[in-house]
Structures are given as C-alpha cells and as structure tokens.
Amino acid sequence: MEESEGQKCEPNLPPSGDSRQMPQQGRSNLHVTSQEDAACRRPRERLSNGNARAQVSKPARNIPRRHTLGGPRSSKEILGMQPSEMDRKREAFLEHLKQKYPHHATAIMGHQERLRDQTKSPKLSHSPQPPNLGDPVEHLSETSGDSLEAMSEGEVPSPFARGSRTRASLPVVRSANQTKERSLGVLYLQYGDETKQLRMPNEVTSTDTIRALFVSAFPQQLTMKMLESPSVAIYIKDDSRNVYYELNDVRNIQDRSLLKVYNKDPSHAFNHMTKAVNGDMRMQREIVYARGDGLVAPRPGSVAHPPHVIPNSPPSTPVPHSLPPSPSRIPYGGSRPMAIPGNATIPRDRLSSLPVSRSISPSPSAILERRDVKPDEDMSSKNLVMFRNEGFYADPYLYHEGRMSIASSHGGHPLDVPDHVIAYHRTAIRSASAYCSPSLQAEMHMEQSLYRQKSRKYPDSHLPTLGSKTPPASPHRVGDLRMIDLHPHLNTHGPPHTLQPDRASPSRQSFKKEPGTLVYIEKPRNTSGLSSLVDLGPPLVEKQGFAYSTTTIPKDRETRERMQAMEKQIASLTGLVQSALFKGPITSSSKEASSEKMVKATANRNQADGAGTAHVSAGKVLGSVEFSLPPSQPLPAGTSPIHTSLLDMRRNVAELRLQLQQMRQLQLQNQEILRAMMKKAELEISNKVKETMKRLEDPVQRQRTLVEQERQKYLHEEERIVKKLCELEDFVEDLKKDSSSTGRVVTLKDVEDGAFLLRQVGEAVATLKGEFPTLQNKMRAVLRIEVEAVRFLKEEPHKLDSLLKRVRSMTDVLTMLRRHVTDGLLKGTDASQAAQYVAMEKATAAEVLKHQEETAHAPGQPLHCSTGSPGDVKSEVVPLSTMTVHHVQSSPVVMQPSQHSSALMNPAQNLPGGTRPHTASPPAITQEVTSAQSAPGPQSPQTPVNGSSMQSLFIEEIHSVSAKNRAVSIEKAEKKWEEKRQNLEHYNGKEFEKLLEEAQANIMKSIPNLEMPPASSPVSKGDAAGDKLELSEDSPNSEQELDKIGGKSPPPPPPPPRRSYLPGSGLTTTRSGDVVYTGRSMSKVSSEDPGPTPQTRATKCPPEEPASAWAPSPPPVPAPSSKEEEEEEEEGDKIMAELQAFQKCSFMDVNPNSHAEQSRANSHLKDTRAGATAPPKEKKNLEFYHEDVRKSDVECENGPQVESQKVTAGALRPSGPPKWERVMVDSISDTSRTSECRADTFTEENATPNKSLFRDSRNYSQKNVPKVSFSSSGLNSLEGEINKGPNVSGLQCAIPDLENQKLNFGKTKEIGQQGQENADKSHIPLPTRSAEFSIHDVKTQDQDVPVTGYGQVVLRSKVGRHANMNMNEDGESTPSSPSEEHTATDNIAFMITKTAVQVLSSGEVHDIVSQKGQDVQTVNIDGRKETASQHEGTEGEEPVVCLDKKPVIIIFDEPMDIRSAYKRLSTIFEECDEELERMLTEEKIEEEEEDENEDSGVRTSSQMSCEQVDSRSDRMGQKAETQSQPHVLSAELLTPGVQGVRKAEQRKLSSADSPDSGNKCGMVDDQFESPKKKFKFKFPKKQLAALTQAIRTGTKTGKKTLQVVVYEEEEEDGTLKQHKEAKRFEITRSQPEDALKTMARRQEQLSPEGTLPASRTDEIRKSTYRTLDSLEQTIKQLENTISEMSPRALVDTSCSSNRDCGASLPHMAQEVSPRSLLVLDEVPPAPEPPTSISPASRKGSSTTPQTSRMPVPMTSKNRPGSLDKASKQSKLQDPRQYRQANGSAKKAGGDCKPTSPSLPASKIPALSPSSGKSSSLPSASGDSSNLPNAPATKPSIASTPLSPQAGRSAHSASLIPSVSNGSLKFQSPPHAGKGHHHLSFALQTQNGRAAPTTSSSSSPPSPASPTSLNQGARGIRTIHTPSLASYKAQNGSSSKATPSTAKETS
C-alpha cells in the first residue's frame, strides 16, 4: 500500500495535475488506507513510509513547512512547489467553489479535477490533502507516505539538521531521524493545520526530543523557546478514544503516534500558521488520514478539490480542508454507508480514527472542545472536527465550531459524497475557519456541506460574527447540536438525499474548499463532492447522482444565480442570526454554542425539509453558508432549491430568533434561579456563620479559642526561639572548634555576632518566660470551668440532698439548740457536754445541712458559725462548704474537713452530727448555744461516737442560726446554684460526661482515703464524706451560717455555691467559720482545731475531719461560696490540686490522702474547718497523730488547735476571697461574740470561741453563759471524740482540754478576739483576711484548747475573747481605718499591713491606735530614730515590728512630704532588714518559750489575724494588729502566755502588714513585745521586698495607700512581688477601709448586739468581693511577676517568715512568732489578692491547702520541712529551687498533711530552727521547748522556717505554707496545696507545740513529724529533709532543725 500510495502520490505530487490520479489512486488507496486508517493511523504512517508517497506527501507537507521551515522543503522539490501549489490550489479551489455552486456533475468533475490538482499540489503541500482529495487510498498512502517519509527521512533529518535553526539538533531526535530507523516507526507531528511525518528518533528521551522534532518539522513556525513556554503543550492522540492527551510521558510515544503542538492561547494558537500553511498542511494530513480512513469515495472529490482547495485556501490547504470533510463525510457515509458503503465505512472508520485524532490535534481548541463537545460521538463528526481542527488551527475557535458542525453534519449525512463534499467543504471550511469564526464554521457545518460551504463563504463576510459568536460557545458542542439537528432532517429526507444535499457536497465542498475565497466554497464543495463521488468511483458518483450528483449538479447549475442571490440573503440573514445569536450567546458561551447549534440545526432541517433532495439541502446550506460570500459564490444550479433553502434559512433565522428569545428567557430564568440559589446559599452560609460566631462569641468558647490561639502562638514562638538557639549553639560550637583548631581563626566579629545572637535569643526566651504565666493563668481559667462543671455535676445532687436534709433537720436542730441554749451551753467542759456535743452535732448535722443551704445563700453565716467553738466547727464547716463549693473544683474532698464540723456540708455522711454541726455551726453561731455546740459539733464529727450528741448540739446551734438564716441562705444558695447551673449549661454533655468521669475516677481514688484513716477516722471519714457532700450541698447554708455567724450582717458575700467539696477535698471551715483549704496538714489542723474548740470537737474532728478531709467523700457541697471564690482565685491550682489530690488520695490515705484532700481542702474549705479538716488528716495521720496526742495531750490539743488554725488559715487562703470573706465575717462575728463572750465568760467564749463568738456576737449576748458551758462540754465531747479518734491522744487531750479550755478559753478568747480583730481588720481591708483571722482565731482557740486537751476549744474561747476585743478594737479601728486611709496632714505616719502601706495623718494614727490598741504596732521615727511603741503590748518582747501579727504604724515625728516620708520609710526598712532577721530569730525563740504555755493558741489566732491583716492591707493589718493588741491585753488578763500569743498575733498582724511594710512588721512585733524596746522591722524578706517596692512606688506616685503584695509562697517564684504589687495597687484603701469598717461595725454590733446587721454583712460581702477581685488581679500580676519577684519573694519570705514568726513568737512566745511569720508568709501569699493574703493565712492553716490543691498539699504537710526549704528557696531565690522546694514542700506537705497535726510540731521545730536561722531560730528552739505553742503557733515554725524559708524558701512548713501558698498559689495550684499543707503542718505543729496541747514539738512533733514526714516525705521527704538540713545550716538553729529534721525524716 505504501508503495502504491507512494507511487501514486509521487506522480500525483510532482504533477499537481496528477491530483486526479491521486484521487483515483487515493480512492483505491483510500479503501485500503481508509480501512487502515480506520483501524488506526498507522496504516497511513506505513503509507507515509512509502518513499514515493513520502516524497509526494512531503511536498504536501512541505507547504505547511514552507511556513514552518524553509529547510524542510529540502525533503522534496514538492516543498518548493508547495507555495506555488498552495497558491494554485487556492486559485483552483476558488474556481472549484464557483463551479461547485452548480453542484452539477460537471461542476463536480471540475471540482474533482481541481481536487486532483489539489491532491497533487496539496499532496505536495499536505500529505493529508491527497487522501482528502480523490485518491483515498493512493492519495492517502502517497500523501501519508510522502509526507511521512519526506518528513521522517528528508524533513526529519533536515528538520533536525536544519531544525538547527531552532535547535541545531536533539541527539536523540537527530540520531533517530538521521539513522532513519523506520523500525521505530513514524511520528505524525501536527502544528496548526499542518501535519508532518517524521521518522521516530531512535530513542525519545525527553520532551525536549519531541520539541526538537517539532522544531525540525516546523522550523518556521516553531522554536524551542516557543515550545518550552508554558502556554504551549504537546498532545498525543489516543486513537482508541479520538482524544488528545497532554504528553506527559514520552514513553507513550509509539509508532504512528500523532503528536500535536497545541498553543493554549487560542488567539496565538496557530491562527497565523493555520490560516496559512499550517492549517492547509494539517488539513492535508488530516485529509490524508481521514481519506485513508474514509476518503475512498471522497478522494475523487478530494482530488478534484485539492486543487481548488489549494488555490482556494492557501492558508489552509484545500486538500486538508477537503480531507476533513471527507472524514466527516465518511462518518456520515459510515452512518449511511449507502452513500459510499464500502468506502464510506472504511474511510469513515479510518477517518474517524485518524481524522478525529488529527482534528483533535489540529486545533488546540478542538482538543479541549472535542472532549467537551463530543466529536467522538460521531467518528465522522470527529473526523470532520479533526479536519476542521486542521482548518481550525487557522482559527482554533472557529475551527472548533466548524469542526464540530462539520463532524455533526457529516455524521448526520451517511453519504460519502457529502463527506467528500464536506472534505472539500472542509478544505473550504479550513480556509473558512482560517477566516471565519468557529461559530460560522459551525453553522456551515450545521448545514453540513452547504453550511460548510457557506461558512467557507461566510468565513470572510460572515465568519467574523459567527466566529466571534462561536468561539464563546463551545464550537464542538454547537457543531454537535447542529449536526444532530441536521442529521434528523437529512435522515428524514433520506440518508442519501439528506447527506447529499447536506453534502450538496460537491458544490458545497467546492464552496467550502474555496473557503480560501469562501464564496466558492460551496461550488468547490459540490465539485469536490462530485469529484469525490467520481473519485470514489461509481458508488460515490452514484450516491452523488441519486442523492446529490444528478440533482445537485443540475440544481447548482439551475440555481447558481439564484443561489448566489439567496446566499446573499442568507448571508444577511445569517449575519442577523449571528448577531442575534452572538448577542445572546455572548452572555454565555454555552448558550451561544447551543444557539448556534440550534441555528445550524434549523438550517439543516430547513435544508432537509425545504430541499427534499440533497441539492435543496445543499442549496440551503450553500445559500446560508455562501450568502456571506454571495458575490464570489456562483449560484448553484437549481435556484428553486436555493430559494427554498433561503426560505428555510429565513425560517431558521426566525426560529433561531425565537430560540434566542427563549434562550434569553431561559437565561433570565436561570439567572433568577441562580440568584435564588445564591440567596439560599447565602442564607445558609450566613446562618452557619452566625452559629459559628455565636459559638465563638460564647465566652467560654471564645476564651478557649483565644487561649488556644495564644498557646499556638506561644508554641510557635517557642519553636522559633528553640530553632534560633540551636542555630546559635551550632554557631558557637563551630566557633569553639575553629578556635581550638589552629587552621581556622575566630575573629572578634564572629564572637560578637554570637554574643549579639545570644542576647537576642536570651531576650526572646525571657520574653517567652514572661508570657508563659499569663498563658498559664488563661489556660487554667479555661480548665477551671471544666473542672468546676464536672464537680458541679457530681456534687450538685449531693448538695441538693444535703440541703434538703439540712432543711428537714433545721427544725429539730433549732429545737435542740433552744434546749441546749437553756440547758447545755455551760456543759462545754463536762464529759456530758461531749455527749451533748455529739448529740448536738447530730442535730446540728441536719441543721448544718439546712444551714449550709442557707450558707450557700449567705456565706457570711458560716463566719458566724465560726464564732462558737461548735459554731467554729460549723463556721469552719460552713466556710468549708463555701470554700468547698468554691474549691470543689480542686477537690470535692473538701468535705472531709467539713465532716468534722459536721462534715459541714455532708453531716449525714461522716458524722451527721458533726457534719451538720458544721453546717449548723453558722446557725449555732447565731445562737450562743449554737456556738458552744458548734465547737462540740466539729469534735463530734471528729469522733463518730460523740458525733450524735455533738451533732445534736450542732443541729441545735444550726437550727437557731438557720431559723434566722435558713430562708435567706436557701434562697441565696438556690440562686447561686442556679447561676452555677446556668454557667454549666455552657458545657456540652459530652464534655461534662468526660469531665465527670474523670472527676469521678479521681474522687473514687480519693474516697478510699476517706475510709483509710483509723477506725474512728474511717467512720468520721464516711461521715465526713457525707458531711462534706452535705456541706458542699449545704455550702450555701454554710455560707449562710457564716453570714449569720458573721453577725446577722452578711459576711463576705458567700461565694456562689459553685461546688461542694468532697470530704477529701480538703476544704474546711475554721472555727471562725473560715473556709480553709486543708491539705493533709489542714486536716490535721482541723482535727486539732476542733479539739481545742470543743474537746469533743477536737477529738472528734481529728478523726472525722481527717476522714472528711482525707476521705474524698462525695463532692462536699460545703463552702460553695468559698469554693466559688477559690475557684476564681485558685481554679488552676484547684484543678491541679484536685487532680493531684484525687490521684494522691488513693495512695496517700493518711498522708497522701490528707495531702490530696488537703489540696482539695485547700482549694475548698478543709482548712476552714480546722477541726473538720484536721480530722481527715488526723484520721489519716490519726495513728501518728493519735500517738502524738497520746504522747502529749496538750500537744495533741495544741496540735489540733494549731493545725486547725493552720487549716483555717490555709483554708481561708485557698478558699480565696470568699473564704476570706467568710472567715472575716466569722471572725467579725466571732470577735463580737467573743467580745460578748468575754464579757459573759471565758468558759462561754471557750465554748463559743469562733462559732460561738460569732453567734454569740449576735445570739450569744444572751446565750453567752449557756453557750460557754456548751462549748466546754462541746470541747469535752469533741475532745473526747478527738481522744477517741486519736484514741489516747484525743482522750488525753480532752481532759487537758477541759482544763485548758477554761485557761485557754480566756486565752483562746483573747487570741480569738485578737485573731478575730485581726480578722476583722483584715476583713475590713480584705474579707478573706477576716476569714483568715477567723481561722487564726480558730487556730488560737485550737492552740488554747490543746492546753486543756482541746486547745482548740480554749483557742476558740480565746478567739471569742479575742474576737470581742477585735470587735471593740475593730470598732475603734474602723474609724481609724478610714482615717488611716487619709494621708496625715501634719506628721505623716505609715500604716504598714501585709497588704498595704497606707499614709496616715497623726489624727488617723491616733484613732487607729486608740481603736486597735495592741492590734497596731506603732513606731515613732524621730529623724532617723525609730521607736516602737506597743499600743497594748502586754509582754515585753523585743520591740520587733512584725507585720506578721499587727499592722505597723510608723509615725514620723517631723512633718514631711509624702514622697520624702516614703523615702524615709524605705530607708528605715533597709536599716531594719538585718536587725529584723536577728530579732525575728530571737523573738521566735522567746515567743516559743512564752507561747509554749498557751501563747501558741493565742499566737495562732494572732497569726491568723495577722495573716488576715496581711492579706488585707496595711490598714487592715494595722487594725488586725490593733485587734491583736487588744487581744494581747486580753491575753495579759488571761495569762502572760496568752498575752504573748496575742502579742505574737499582733506582731504577726504587723508582720502580715509588714510584708507590705516589712519594717513595720518588725516594729509592730517589737512594739507588741516591748514598746519600750527599740523597734525592729521584722518582715519576711518577701514582705520587705514587697514593702520596699510599694514604698518605692509610693515615692514615685505619692499615693496615700500602696498595696503591698507579698506572696510568701510566691516569694520563690517571684509571685510575692507580683502579689505585693498587685495587692499594693489593686487593694485600694477603700477596700481595706471598707473591710475594716465593716468588720469594726460588725464587731461593734456583734459585741453589743451579738448579731451583725444584714447591711453590714452586705458591706462585708461587697468588700470581700471587691477584695476578691483585687486579689485575683493581684494574683495574676503576681504570677506574671513571679520570676521577677522570685528573688525578692525569697528575701521577703525569709523576712516575712522571720517577721511573721518573730511577730507571732513575740506575742505568742517564739513559736507564735514563727507562726505569725508563717502566717505572715502565708499572708504575703494571701496578699496576692486580699483573698490571697487570706489564703496566706489560710495557707498558714488552710492556705497551704490552697497551694495544696495541687501538689502543694504535700508541701503543706512537709511545710515544716518545706519551710526549711522555703527559707532556702527564698534565700536561693531561684525559680528552680523554689520549684524544688515547693515541690518538696508540696509533696511533703501533701503527704504530711494527714500527719500535719503532729508533723507540724516536729516540722515546725525543724522549720523553726530554719526560721530561727533567719530570725526564728530562737523561735525554732522555742518551738521545740514550747512545742505546744510552737505547734499552736504555726508561725513559730513558720517563723523559724520562715526565716530560713525566707532565706531559702519561706514556703516550707509554715513559711513555706505561706510562701508556698502564695508562691504556689500564684505559681501553680500545687503550690497552693503546698501552702495549705505547710500551713497545716505549721498549724498542727503549732497546735502540737501549743503549750496547752503540746509543750514541745518533741512528743507530738516526733509522731507528727514522722507522720508528717512520712506523708510529706513521700512527696517531699527528700526535699523536705534537704530543706530542713539547709534550713538548719542556714538557720544555724541546727538544734531545732536537726530534731525537726530527724523527726520529719523519721
């Protein structure tokens, strides 16, 4: 075939005249070729391989090459001929078109001849052309062979060689072509309309090879640069699919692959080339292929056409054009083989295969559009399209449409003749496409042959419109549609006729082929069609004849003229249609396409309809197509058909217009639908966005998102810094290597660069570190909510149940309380009273439940509960409940502490009585009896056996109080809970479930601990758990009670009952009603505290409270208010502590549980319920603690007392502002009550110390005596319970307790008053402080109680007296407080409290001094001289002004500027700093000795008061100090020990204030101890630093009131400074003033009325809230500045510890001083916010628990040891050290918490020595000697440890508690827990040391210490021991430190 084809081609090619031969040959070949082509192009390629044909085709191809490259011409002379041939062809094609119009045989013949000529020349020009022409096979083969061969042999080599123009050579390509290894096969390269055959290179290595081939094939048109541009793509045809795919893998190139260069930019595509040579060549090639496929029949036409085509369309070789039509024809033929059955079929297939691919390849658009359009549908259509593509390359867009339409039209027409016509037409079309727009071509195609011819005509005139129109539309699709339309019509007419008319092909083809002229396209088409028919042979001719030829030709002849006219009309019509369509379609290309298709379809239909004959259709088509070229197009023969077609065209136009209108309408409708859809989508999107925004706007979610973003930002920054650091390290390493190696020299510039980079990195790291605390706080805040929610969900049911129970029991309790008021209040000291207390507790348990509900509503009431000793228990419980609720987050275990005091919230659980008493305690406070019962109540909870009687007493108390407060409390609780629920609603169920599950798991872990304590303790624990739950549930009640206790006036607003604290949560209420976050230490303290308050309670509390505190009973509801406050304040800590506590609770049943629970208690109210909390601790440490108690009843009593106080302090602190508020309220009420009680009787006060005091203040004025006796019996019963709980210890304690109760009762009263005064003062400045003071009072009571065995009772009595004194003093102080706020007009005086430095006028100073008396330490500074005068310093202790105990007033005799006064003050502080430490050490020792007796208790109260004062503000501190002084006076009245304690307390207050003004602390201490002695400012270094900074600020700003934020625990972290600053700036004078005023008023009212007006309570609450807010802010600030504060904090801590301890010790013996220091230290932490200071106090007792919340609980326990560490830490002032110390403190504290009561004693001594080192070494020794006091005076330990702790880490045992608390609190919840534990320990130790209970830490400390140590040792033993050791070393009080260490380690 190849040879034949080649031969034929050659003859044909050389002689363009041979075109006819070619057509003939082509025909014969076409059959073969077409078949082969149909199968695939390879046959053609093979043909192309033929030399002759190659030559022939080459020329054909060369034509394009002419354009492509001059070089390729060398392949054959044909190349040279091509240009001339092309011109000739064009001319001939025009002639053919003219002839074609007649559509007569002659025309066809002429067309055929032309085609033949074309074939020859076209073959020369395009190998495809010949096939397209007449000789299908021959031509195709010749053309293909020639072109292929020429291209592959001649051209390929030359292209590569000559292609060197673009690229000299691609080795692969060149080698392949040069070697001419045909074995590889041939490649068809198509560019534009040109198709060239090239020999495949030996190897195609890359696309560059292909590009080189293309460049060599088309050197003129293509360059490597062009081909490499992104806009040019090489496509390879997939024969199977007739689709071009982008050539991605050169391995896909195989023999006969058709590659096409496709310019993605249609405008740039191949229009120039295409129109010129490329189009022709491509058309030729397509024709060749198509013809090979199906040109058998067409070939004659093609042959005839080629000449025409060539002349007609120089741009696009006519042959190619004709060829495409032939392929399309063939498809039609295929469809209707009738036309050219054999030929058509074969060619069609071939055409479809080859042409389609070609068509696809020819036009870039075609490729894409073909896919879209479906040229594939009809192989013929595809062929047409392909041909068209070739033509199209001239105008890709035009061609596409043309192609489409051609393909469709051809597909529609089965006749081959039409195909041929089309082929010619195609040639025309190609040229048309070159000239026309695709739309025009498409239309022409629609008409099919006619259309094509017309489009050829149109192309020039018409095309623009159509073209433009079509391009927008997908030409292919338009073509298809038109084809479809045409086909149906044609079919209806009859396949032959239809096809023929459509293909009126001869004329049409000629016309189309003439497209060069476009006018003649139709004629040529007809001619070509005829020729093709002829060429095809009889079949074609016949087909044409019957279908087209005969009719068509005559028609053409007849109508030629008419046709021309009609065509003109049609052209105009088409123009109209086009314009219309164009306008419409322009809007949417798809619409245009469809409209065009429709138009073409209609035209076709019209043609078919109008011309029943093919001619008519053809005429129509021609008319429409030609009318654009009317002048040039000769009217086809048969005007009538043309006329008909014109009419049809008009109809079509009308229809098209209608369709256009419809389409426009449709478009509008679609637009409307789209708009609607868009609107709908917009609505949906907006809704979603709104939902998302709402979700984002949800505060919780938004906060979470913001925090997460911040965290990611932080992490990103961190990563960046780490990267920088790594790079810097590498750089430095390289420098080191370079420096070490002699070869390279390190330049100074390199080093400097490294240093510069290092500085940058260091700054970045520092910045990052500064940013972390903020992020930490934010993340904690976010987590806090979840934890709270979980707790709430878990505790709410219990809370509700307990509330209901309490409400139910309220009536009974009230009845019992009335009975007790009349019958049993004075039985407090009798053994029967223990039973009574048990019964009362049982009764109170119910009452407490109710009360707790009320308390939840009125948190202030829990403070009232604190008033009486039963009240204290209750108030502890209530605060606990309040705190618990607040701290439940951290640990529901809080309920454990509660359980003592009736497990405040869960009286039912552990000791219904005990729990209820706690709950009822607030009511009890309201009633005198209640307070007395309250104390027993707590004991009762401690001792399950006594629980019943105590519970009854408690219930009665609670009833009395609850009767008053129940409704309000319940309402408040309900409101709070409702709020909480609403808040919780923010959480989704799943989260809650998860949190609940986790919390439950933690709680379950903790619960075993509840049951772990000794038998009694397990029972207590169970009760405690229940009580705690009840407390938690009743938290509102507890708060209510507190409020009631607070003296009808609502105490600090009860924190919302957010959470009930589990018994193990570690929240307790102190006697003062403060909610203490008790860690294990707290539990112990609570136990001890209950003991002292009522012996029964002390006894009972230790076991039960430990159970309660330690047993993670159901989430204690107690202290919801406190909890809320705590939640806010220590949510993060709580969360951490809770997690830790839960985890630790399980393994630390005694110690760990205490620790864990204490953490919780710290978070909650364990410490607040000193007794309650202590019991859990005691229960867990019960064995140890009981042993300790047995060893030393006094110690045990004191230990519990101290512990209770510590717990209270810790609880207060942890509980946060709410706790403080409660405590303050309680303290106030206590003070008032105590005042009354004092007036009434010591015994009464003993009975009512805290709770009684508060209640007495309100209720007890009348019930004082009964209440006192009840307190005694309550104490006894409590003591008995404690004894039972501790077994021996508790019992022993009970006996001494009764004795000491009276003794200590007075002392306790004094202390309590003092503490309460302090608390009141603190309360005024900071409600939390009041709570702390209350705790202090409780502690004091506890300490006193220990003397009797229930030092707590005594303490409470003392607290009661103290409270009364405080109230009086506060009353005085209140005016003073306001005056304090005012700057001195004449001589300036500074009132330095722990939290604030206030400028006072002399008048204000006088008022304050007169009001507060001993509670304020005054230092007169004449010039440089400072004289400390103790307002009411009874004992001549060293005149050390220590903020620990009292506010320090520094009076400058000479008038001066505020700023200068500040400067002076700072100078004084600096001068006094060194002395302060020494003084503190000595003072501590002295105070320890003094306090050994009963000063411990007083001191504890004092410390608490001081802490409270500290936490409040300087003014508060001063008031507290003033209170302390009055208390000290009371102490003087009572006993020197008590006085000492009071002094210590006062000093502590001053120390507490002193952190604000460190020197003042020392001054106050000195004043306290010996006004005559030269005052020394004893401030923990942290405090001192804080004061110094505050003063500095004052110097700058000249503000009258400076907030001193001393965070003892933060000291190490630097939180202290932050706290100080935060406090200094956040705590406004108004707050302290308000608090003080409120407290003073409340106390005053309470004293006279025994009740606080609601308004006062409201005021207190408000002030408390304000304080809380400020505290929170302060905490944040502190946390932010922790690192900065770390050093100062450490210094302050040591100073503070010394001051605190010193102050306390001076007042309460050395131990009290340490304790005060501890409290102070704790207070400084408390100052973080006012609450913080309270927490600091709480940390002393319960503050540690705060820290304890987290790991801190352990620290609390280890606090003694931790204290040492704290000193170290503060001395080290290294955050890491701080962390380590705190960590050890945390662990130790947490672990030791349970054993805290005993451990604190031992630890405190150890710490005391360490403290002693700073200034409490003496205290430390004093602690050892005066262990009872020392334990009682946690500060003693705190002092000793604080000193060192201040030096190292004031966060250790006592100082650590405070420091850890503060530091930890700010640093982390764990620290808060630590603080609690430490405080607990300190308190416990103080209690243990308390002269009443434990004379020396030796006996209790050893057991306690071991226990503590064991517990603490677990967590912090190692650290603790080192800390102790370091403390020893630092303190130089090795003796004490050693014993303590030994004990602790043991």
UniProtKB/Swiss-Prot annotation:
Gene Ontology CC annotations of this record: centrosome; cytoplasm
Compartment(s) of residence: Cytoplasm, Cytoskeleton, Microtubule organizing center, Centrosome; Cytoplasm
Biased composition annotated in UniProt, kind: Acidic residues: 1484-1495
Coiled coil: 557-581, 644-685, 962-990, 1469-1495, 1659-1688
Region (Disordered): 1-83, 113-176, 305-324, 339-374, 455-512, 853-875, 891-947, 1008-1221, 1482-1567, 1622-1664, 1691-1946
Pro residues biased stretches: 308-324, 1049-1058
Annotated glycan sites: 357
Biased composition (Low complexity): 352-367, 1806-1825, 1890-1899
KW Magnesium (keyword) present: no
Biased composition (Polar residues): 18-36, 891-909, 927-947, 1151-1162, 1498-1508, 1739-1759, 1851-1866, 1920-1946
Record-level GO BP terms: embryonic skeletal system development
Residue(s) carrying Phosphoserine: 169, 361, 365, 474, 809, 1032, 1035, 1038, 1049, 1466, 1741, 1843, 1899, 1902, 1905
KW Phosphoprotein (keyword) present: yes
Chain positions with Phosphotyrosine modification: 244, 393
Keywords: Coiled coil, Cytoplasm, Cytoskeleton, Developmental protein, Glycoprotein, Phosphoprotein
Disruption outcome: Mice display a kinky-tail phenotype in about half of homozygotes with defects in the nucleus pulposus and annulus fibrosus of intertebral disks. Shortening and curving of caudal vertebrae 20-25 is apparent by the age of 2 weeks.
Origin: domain of life: Eukaryota
General function of this protein: Required for normal development of intervertebral disks.
UniProt subunit comment: Interacts with CPNE4 (via VWFA domain).
Protein name (Swiss-Prot/TrEMBL): Sickle tail protein
Taxonomic source organism: Mus musculus (Mouse)
